C-alpha cells in the first residue's frame, strides 16, 4: 500500500514551522504547546507577543505538558482568554493570580484563570484589587475548583461565582452582587 505524502522544497525554517503548525493534526492532533512552539519558531507576531507579555508577567508556559510553579499548563485556555478579553485584562488576571498565590501550581488551572478573568471583566470598576488579592490568598485555588464543580453553568461562571463568594466573605459593605 503506497503512502501518500507531500514534499515541499525551498522552505525556510520559519516556513516549515508555520506549515507544521497549520498542517499537522490530520493523523495526530497537536497539543496547544506544540502549536505555540511551532508558531514561535515561525516567528508568528501574535504568538511572540502573547508569550512575551505572559513572560513579562512572571509566568511561563508548560510546553512539556508538566505542571510546575509559575507555569501555565492550559496554554489553549490562556490564549483563548487573551483573545477574548484582550491584553490588558489577560495581564491583570496573571498579576492578580501571581500576587495571591505566588506561583502555586493549582492557581494556573483552566477554571481558575477563567474565573479570575471573568470576575475582573464583570466587576471592572467595582471591585477592590487589593481586597481581591487578599481574599484569594486566604483560599487554596484547588478549593475554588472543587466548589465550582458542584455548581452549574459554564466553567468561567462557576469559578467566577466561587471567586465572588470568596471576595465578599463576611463583609456586607464590601460585598458585590451576583452578575452574569
Where do the language-model regions lie?
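Accessory terminal alpha-helical modules
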Residues: 2-180
Amino acid at each position: 500500500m503506497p503512502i501518500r505524502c507531500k514534499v515541499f522544497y525551498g522552505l525556510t525554517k520559519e516556513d516549515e514551522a508555520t506549515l507544521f503548525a497549520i498542517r499537522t493534526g490530520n493523523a495526530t492532533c497537536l497539543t496547544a504547546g506544540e502549536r505555540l512552539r511551532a508558531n514561535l519558531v515561525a516567528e508568528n507576531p501574535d504568538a511572540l507577543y502573547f508569550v512575551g507579555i505572559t513572560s513579562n508577567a512572571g509566568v511561563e508556559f508548560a510546553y512539556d505538558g508538566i505542571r510546575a510553579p509559575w507555569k501555565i499548563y492550559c496554554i489553549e485556555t490562556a490564549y483563548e482568554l487573551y483573545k477574548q478579553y484582550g491584553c490588558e485584562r489577560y495581564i491583570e488576571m496573571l498579576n492578580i493570580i501571581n500576587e495571591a498565590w505566588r506561583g502555586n501550581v493549582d492557581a494556573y488551572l483552566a477554571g481558575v484563570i477563567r474565573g479570575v478573568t471573568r470576575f475582573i471583566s464583570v466587576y471592572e470598576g467595582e471591585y477592590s484589587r487589593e481586597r481581591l488579592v487578599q481574599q484569594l490568598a486566604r483560599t487554596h485555588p484547588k478549593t475554588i475548583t472543587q466548589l465550582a464543580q458542584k455548581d452549574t453553568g459554564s466553567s468561567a461562571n462557576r469559578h467566577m461565582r466561587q471567586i465572588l463568594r470568596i471576595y465578599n466573605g463576611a463583609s456586607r459593605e464590601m460585598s458585590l452582587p451576583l452578575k452574569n
